[in-house]
């Protein structure tokens, strides 16, 4: 497996020398922003119960688990940096820290990415010290969805009501007089230290960016609520607020969804040829 990784990484680096996979560094109009490294896993369905490694994963179907890391920019389509094919019942974060470390090492060898700022994005399945530490050790920033544990809920509860800012979202209206969005979706942030249950040297300071939308319960109720309730989506990021403010950080984090298109493309192409 490691030998195949070496072949794939050398091929990618050599290809980048001949084609601007992530854009040309220093070229006119070049994107001065981040290189985004997105990490995600997906289930590839199989049907033979005796197939080696097959099992039931988070999706509830029998299959194999593919773990992917891609790199992209605002102007360049995703490029696969690393991949692992794992047994279907494996937990999503298993081996993710090593994949992140390997992928960031490959990224540094790509000519256009030399000296670029790198942001690793992932969903809550990868919110763990090992994965975050691997990214930070390699010199990248992180933007990772958090799990709603007690510390996160307490941080959200402490956000001042005046701190919420409307954002561009479905059904939002832009007010030209005030230059703001009139929207049901709002964002706010608070300082946050991740992994406080670990020893002090392993705690990671950063920001907790929270997006909230009204809770729209389709079921009728005989007891209306006394106040508006919301659904919250929070993520932890180590980016500088002067580089990515609250609204921009939220937009940037939502861009992680691009890897779902990569998953779909692979399942309709290369991964479709796996024996099922």
Label each residue range with its predicted role.
Residues 1, 33-43, 78, 118-127, ...:
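Short, conserved catalytic/metal-binding motifs centered on acidic residues
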Residues 1-71:
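Active-site-proximal, Lys/Arg-enriched surface segment
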Residues 39-41, 71-73, 82-85, 122, ...:
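Glycine-rich, histidine-containing beta strand-loop boundary motifs that form or position
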Residues 47-52, 79-85, 95, 112, ...:
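Short acidic, glycine/serine/threonine-rich loops at helix termini
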Residues 56-112:
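Electropositive, glycine- and tryptophan-enriched low-complexity nucleic-acid-binding patches
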Residues 90-151:
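Domain-level cores of phosphate- or acyl-group-handling catalytic modules
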Residues 143-265:
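An anionic, glycine-rich sequence signature occurring as long contiguous blocks
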Residues 247-251, 271-276:
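Short beta-alpha connecting loops at secondary-structure transitions
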């Amino acid at each position: 497996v490691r030998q195949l990784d070496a072949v794939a990484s050398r091929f990618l680096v050599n290809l980048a020398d001949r084609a601007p996979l992530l854009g040309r560094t220093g070229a006119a109009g070049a994107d001065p922003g981040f290189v985004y490294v997105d990490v995600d896993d997906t289930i590839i369905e199989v049907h033979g119960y005796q197939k080696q490694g097959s099992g039931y994963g988070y999706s509830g179907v029998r299959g194999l688990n593919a773990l992917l890391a891609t790199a992209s920019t605002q102007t360049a389509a995703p490029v696969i940096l690393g991949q692992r094919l794992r047994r279907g019942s494996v937990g999503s974060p298993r081996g993710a820290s090593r994949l992140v470390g390997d992928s960031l090492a490959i990224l540094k060898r790509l000519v256009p990415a030399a000296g670029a700022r790198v942001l690793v994005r992932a969903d809550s399945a990868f919110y763990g010290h090992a994965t975050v530490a691997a990214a930070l050790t390699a010199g990248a920033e992180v933007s990772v969805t958090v799990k709603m544990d007690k510390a996160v809920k307490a941080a959200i509860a402490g956000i001042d009501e005046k701190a919420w800012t409307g954002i561009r979202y479905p059904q939002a209206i832009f007010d030209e007089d005030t230059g703001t969005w009139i929207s049901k979706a709002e964002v706010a942030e608070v300082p946050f230290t991740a992994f406080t249950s670990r020893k002090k040297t392993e705690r990671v300071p950063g920001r907790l960016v929270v997006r909230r939308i009204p809770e729209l319960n389709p079921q009728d109720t005989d007891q209306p609520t006394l106040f508006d309730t919301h659904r919250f989506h929070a993520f932890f990021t180590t980016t500088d607020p002067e580089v990515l403010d609250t609204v921009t950080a939220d937009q940037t984090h939502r861009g992680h969804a691009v890897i779902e298109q990569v998953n779909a493309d692979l399942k309709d192409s290369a991964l479709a040829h796996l024996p099922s």
